[in-house]
Amino acid sequence: MNYLYYDYQTGEHCYVNADSKDSADRIAYFYFSEPEFICIDDDDTAEMNGYDTY
């Protein structure tokens, strides 16, 4: 699953590829200090957006 986040500190969007929302949250907080979950996207949408993926 591709979980889309927005980080308020850096002002960037990113995808976290994880099996669950809890896992995605842990990964997002590892890389960013203020991530906010936005939505879940399929692989095609995530690829089209071109955001970094963690």
For each feature predicted by the language model, list its residue ranges.
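Short aromatic-glycine-(Arg/Gly/Cys) micro-motifs in beta-strand/loop hairpins
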Residues: M1-E12
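Short, surface-exposed beta-strand/loop "edge" segments at domain boundaries and coil↔beta transitions
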Residues: E12-V16, T45-M48
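Short, flexible N-terminal segments of the mature chain
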Residues: V16-E34
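Short, mixed-charge low-complexity intrinsically disordered segments
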Residues: Y29-Y54
